[in-house]
Amino acid sequence: MKLQYLVALLSVQAVPPVTAGYIHQYALVGSVIRQPIDQKTQRENLNKLVSDSPLLSLHRTICEIESVSNREGAVGEVLLKYLRDRGFTVEKQIVPADRGTNSTAERFNIWAYPKGCPRPKIILTSHIDTVPPHIKYSLHAPDGDFDRAKVRIMGRGTVDAKASVAAQIIAALKHLKSNKDIPLGLLFVVSEEVGGSGMVHFSNSELNTNPPFFHTLIFGEPTDLTLVDGHKGNLRVTIEAKGVAAHSGYPWLGRSAISEILPILARMDELGDIPVETGGLPSSEKYGRTTVNIGTIKGGAADNVVPETASASIAVRLAAGTPEEAEEIIRRAVHDVSGGSTNITVNFPDSMPYPPIDLDVDVEGFDISTVNYGTDIPKLEIHDEELEVKVKRYLYGPGTIFVAHGAEEGITVGDLEKAVEGYSKLIDAAVKRGWPREVVVN
């Protein structure tokens, strides 16, 4: 009786669903779940899932290659070959190493377009550099019942922004397969994470014509699959203080640079929280308040020495106004706190600060969001001043910015695959729109 009861029980045992031939943790025989599968088998199943998908395998290939800013050459070469093998004409745009780096390796932007279409009307663009350190690519099955869409891909760049790079390429290939005459271009740039010299290089090149030959730009960054209607502006600030060194036992013989800079930094820290009328930085309904982040503070030589120097670097995310207006507010605040001391110096080292950037969101089928982070978008100067219809700029991509740059950077298979659909919608809208009239490009 006991044996019969056991057989009857097993015959009605509920079994977790199996998706795409894979199952997490358990081996399935008939309708009976037996012992957990070993890690080797699970790893093989996950690797097969990736290998069977052109999107996932491309994403894995480029994420496995370290491409920290100023060391993007290796991943660039892989993408060059990948695109050429699939019929694109591909050009290198050599970009010099950023100032202050020791890198001598070649690195470059990638400019790709279908054969016979050197001036595509629609450009998909993202960046191939990442922040340090490189974190190894890895695959992780979901807890509980297996769901293919919930498989998690971890590692540096899996979100920011190689997810966008892979999804944009696959979306472009799918469109060109159905219609080889679609005027699609791909631009993948270097150094987005450290100042944007890659996009600046493209912007200053002969490819950025006046007026532009393109009518649509689709930028790829982690946006949680939302279409972004704008992002905050950016301004960098450095403040330096000079003191006089002395023995800490006789501090009146010197002057502390740290003591001079501290009240100024306290004032800077609150500029985003107080009204413009009382000396604060502006806010807006769309972007909220301007935020001030004191990122680094340096000063002094030892605890028994009155510090001779002190400095701080600050990032300001502008919610309203112009960088020039923000600079004036900051100078005034520093002057008020320091009493106009000549021992305090304020500098704005970014050669290309920018105000809040408004973007296009006129394509149906997307949730809309606003983001606080910066992008390459303001680094590309678009010469459409004389055009009746301006160039469209869209910002969209898979993954969340909340894990980008962190130790837990990662994305799900489902989000990566949905991004291909999202980019396809944006491409379709751009193809349908086209130029309202012919534009002569010099």
From Swiss-Prot:
Pfam families: M20_dimer, Peptidase_M20. SUPFAM superfamilies: Bacterial exopeptidase dimerisation domain, Zn-dependent exopeptidases. It comes from the Eukaryota. Keywords: Glycoprotein, Hydrolase, Metal-binding, Protease, Secreted, Signal, Zinc. Its cofactor is Zn(2+). Zn(2+) 1 binds at D160, E193. GO terms for biological process: proteolysis. InterPro entries: Bact_exopeptidase_dim_dom, Peptidase_M20, Peptidase_M20_dimer, Peptidase_M20A. It is an enzyme of class 3 (hydrolase). Its EC number is 3.4.17.-. GO terms for cellular component: extracellular region. One of its GO terms (molecular function) is metal ion binding. Zn(2+) 2 binds at D160. CDD domains: M20_ArgE_DapE-like_fungal. Binds 2 Zn(2+) ions per subunit. It is found in: Secreted. The keyword Transmembrane helix does not apply. Residues 1-20 form the signal peptide. The active site is at E192 (proton acceptor). Belongs to the peptidase M20A family. Glycans are attached at N102, N343. This is Probable carboxypeptidase PADG_04062.
